[in-house]
Design a protein with these regions (language model features):
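Surface-exposed cleft-lining segments at the edges of enzyme active sites
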Residues: 31, 56-72, 108-112
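Metal-dependent phosphoesterases centered on the DNase I-like endonuclease/exonuclease/phosphatase
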Residues: 73-164
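Residues forming well-ordered secondary-structure scaffolds
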Residues: 36-38, 45, 66-70, 74
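Structured beta-strand-rich core segments of catalytic domains in phosphoester-bond hydrolases
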Residues: 1-58
Length: 173
């Protein structure tokens, strides 16, 4: 078990379970304001690198939405640089973004909700197009496949969810 948590107890963190010992473990991305929140851990193996990532949520207000949008820009730059030396990347985690209308139970009513904002979805599209495959959607095009449900109003039982968790694989793998 390899893990990296936020300095604030109970706030956020990431982990990777592996039976294989990695060649290298990288904690964080080197940007202090994100590393304080335990957002990234990466394990490098002989043939690939696996990253667990936890993107910020913007749902608590404008300040956190701005933080999230800055994170998205910085994360893209970080991954673009990383791909130059570690091209065989597998990025797993909570992106706090529903990529397409199929990934959310009610796209119309959530059109202006953090996690499904047009600018977030556009970022996700461009990020995937920069060299990744959404491994779940590659094999499963069915609607109503979610990874998160609100605790309110029995959302899980009604399958009123959001698909915000992704396993993105370098497209040449």
């Amino acid at each position: 078990l390899y893990w990296y948590s936020a300095q604030k107890k109970g706030y956020s963190g990431v982990a990777i379970f592996s039976k294989i010992k990695p060649k290298h473990v990288e904690y964080g991305c080197g940007i202090e304001k994100y590393d304080f929140e335990g957002r990234i851990i990466r394990l490098d193996f002989d043939s690939c690198s696996v990253m667990s990532v936890y993107h910020p949520s913007g749902s608590s207000g404008d300040d956190r939405q701005a933080f999230k949008m800055q994170w998205l820009t910085d994360f893209q730059n970080y991954i673009d640089d990383l791909k130059k030396k570690l091209p065989n990347l597998i990025l797993c985690g909570d992106y706090n973004i529903c990529h397409k209308p199929i990934d959310i139970h009610n796209p119309k009513s959530n059109a202006n909700t953090s996690g499904f904002l047009p600018e977030e979805r556009e970022w996700m599209e461009q990020f995937i197009q920069s060299g990744f495959i959404d491994s779940f959607r590659h094999f499963n095009q069915e609607p109503h496949q979610y990874s998160w449900w609100s605790y309110r109003a029995g959302s899980r039982g009604k399958n009123l969810g959001w698909r915000i968790d992704y396993n993105l694989v370098a497209n040449h793998l």
